[in-house]
Amino acid sequence: MARYQGPVCRLCRREGTKLFLKGERCYTDKCAIDKKAYAPGQHGPTRRSKQSEYGMQLREKQKARRIYGVLENQFRRYFREADRKKGITGQTLLRLLETRLDNVVYRMGFAASRAEARQFVNHGHIMVNGKRVNVASYEVKPGDEVVVREKSRDIPRVQELKELAEGYRVPEWLEADHENFTGRVVRYPEREEIDVPVEEHLIVELYSR
């Protein structure tokens, strides 16, 4: 399955909530869902029909996939891995998604969106423990150091992000020094620290059918 290349604002409208896929734009009055709080393809707001149980489970899975930019087969593999591990499956699933390298780069404030973070990783701008890593799905672990390559720090967009990061609150499970483009994974995130609008138990129910 190919990665979605269309207008990402349509995805937020489809899910009926902000997925923060557009970086800075999501925090302004230009955000599409603030102007058109109804699904794409409709000519104005209408009452949403009541979804079936399966429909709600499917929508929740799609929402999580879109937030993290993960393809269907990848997402299914994450679920299988979470299901094998000890602990609550849904929370473990979110933890696996949160510890993807592209997400960590985004959470540290080195990119304005997960899509931009994924691009930075793919283009070789990110290093983990002193080695360049260009795989967005790379799983980081507590103690890992994540930095922007020294040669990449003078890129105009990287400098712009440095200014945008002023006042940005880094999650407590991470550390980030925006002045020096360095960060560290302190520990794994707790569920209450993962601020995504996802009801993970519905995803577990979907894959358990």
Swiss-Prot record:
Gene3D superfamilies: Ribosomal Protein S4 Delta 41, Chain A, domain 1 (1.10.1050.10), RNA-binding S4 domain (3.10.290.10)
Keyword Isomerase: no
Molecular-function GO terms, alphabetical: rRNA binding; structural constituent of ribosome
InterPro entries: Ribosomal_uS4 (IPR022801), Ribosomal_uS4_bac-type (IPR005709), Ribosomal_uS4_CS (IPR018079), Ribosomal_uS4_N (IPR001912), S4_RNA-bd (IPR002942), S4_RNA-bd_sf (IPR036986)
GO annotation (BP), single: translation
Gene Ontology terms: cellular component: small ribosomal subunit
Domain S4 RNA-binding: residue ranges: 99-164
Domain of life of the organism encoding this protein: Bacteria
One protein family per Pfam: S4
Keyword Nucleotide-binding: no
Keywords: Ribonucleoprotein, Ribosomal protein, RNA-binding, rRNA-binding
Subunit structure: Part of the 30S ribosomal subunit. Contacts protein S5. The interaction surface between S4 and S5 is involved in control of translational fidelity.
Family classification: Belongs to the universal ribosomal protein uS4 family.
Protein function: One of the primary rRNA binding proteins, it binds directly to 16S rRNA where it nucleates assembly of the body of the 30S subunit.
Name of the protein: Small ribosomal subunit protein uS4
Organism this protein belongs to: Natranaerobius thermophilus (strain ATCC BAA-1301 / DSM 18059 / JW/NM-WN-LF)
Gene label: rpsD
